[in-house]
Swiss-Prot record:
It is an enzyme of class 2 (transferase). It comes from Serratia proteamaculans (strain 568). InterPro entries: rRNA_ssu_MeTfrase_G, SAM-dependent_MTases_sf. This is Ribosomal RNA small subunit methyltransferase G. Belongs to the methyltransferase superfamily. RNA methyltransferase RsmG family. The gene is rsmG. S-adenosyl-L-methionine binds at residues 73, 78, 124-125, 139. Its EC number is 2.1.1.170. Specifically methylates the N7 position of guanine in position 527 of 16S rRNA. It is found in: Cytoplasm. The lineage of its organism: Bacteria, Pseudomonadati, Pseudomonadota, Gammaproteobacteria, Enterobacterales. One of its GO terms (cellular component) is cytosol. Its main location: cytoplasm. Gene3D superfamilies: Vaccinia Virus protein VP39. It catalyses: guanosine(527) in 16S rRNA + S-adenosyl-L-methionine = N(7)-methylguanosine(527) in 16S rRNA + S-adenosyl-L-homocysteine. GO terms for molecular function: rRNA (guanine-N7-)-methyltransferase activity.
Length: 206
């Protein structure tokens, strides 16, 4: 697993300290173990988890701005846990409505010694953003419209951003953005060994 992670990181042009690599591998180990009982992800193979969960999350890191982030519909902690590992100076609130997922996240937090994450069990519309966040991240929403509708109260006005992880570039959705939302950029993400396209849509909340 260590060799596989090293080769993926090298292919992606990402350099990480050993401690962060060990934390990422520890997270995959826990995800694999808990998945057998809790069905946290449809990805069963730990090697594939490295590609589809770890690399697919941390390639977002260079594009994030700010220190306080919320991962909405985080599931088993994606992309929030891998991002928290590689951004130890930032804080990540991990929001999910299912108790079993939040229990898993708390165990990950404890075992990996992550002091910069806060797992929260809540529906997004009931979660108060006090203070508002620098960034709202998600790969859980089917559409940008859904994300903006459910999460409109979370980012800091004028400087907060939405970071939506998508497959193909959602050009049609981008023509239907509501007032007060500005398209900042669409980034084509390069994820080694991942089939299909990946894009990061960055929207600013004005």
């Amino acid at each position: 697993m260590q060799k596989k992670l090293d080769s993926l990181l090298k292919a992606a042009g990402i350099t990480l300290p050993d401690r962060q690599k060990q934390q990422l591998l520890g997270y995959v180990g826990m995800l694999d173990k808990w998945n057998k009982a809790y069905n946290l992800t449809s990805v069963r193979d730990p090697q594939q988890m490295l590609v589809r969960h770890i690399l697919d999350s941390i390639v977002v890191n260079p594009h994030l701005q700010g220190k306080r982030f919320i991962d909405v519909g985080t599931g088993p902690g994606l992309p929030g846990i891998p991002l928290a590992i590689v951004r130890p100076d930032s804080h990540f609130t991990l929001l999910d409505s299912l108790g079993k997922r939040v229990r898993f996240l708390r165990q990950v937090q404890h075992e990996l010694g992550l002091t910069n994450v806060e797992p929260v069990q809540s529906r997004v519309e009931e979660f108060p953003a006090e203070p508002p966040f620098d960034g709202v991240i998600s790969r859980a929403f089917a559409s940008l419209q859904d994300m903006l509708s459910w999460c409109h109260h979370l980012p800091a006005k004028g400087q907060g951003r939405f970071y939506a992880l998508k497959g193909v570039r959602p050009d049609e959705e981008l023509t239907q953005l509501p007032p007060g939302i500005e398209l900042e950029s669409v980034v084509r993400l390069q994820v080694p060994e991942l089939e299909g396209e990946r894009h990061l849509v960055i929207l600013k909340a004005n």
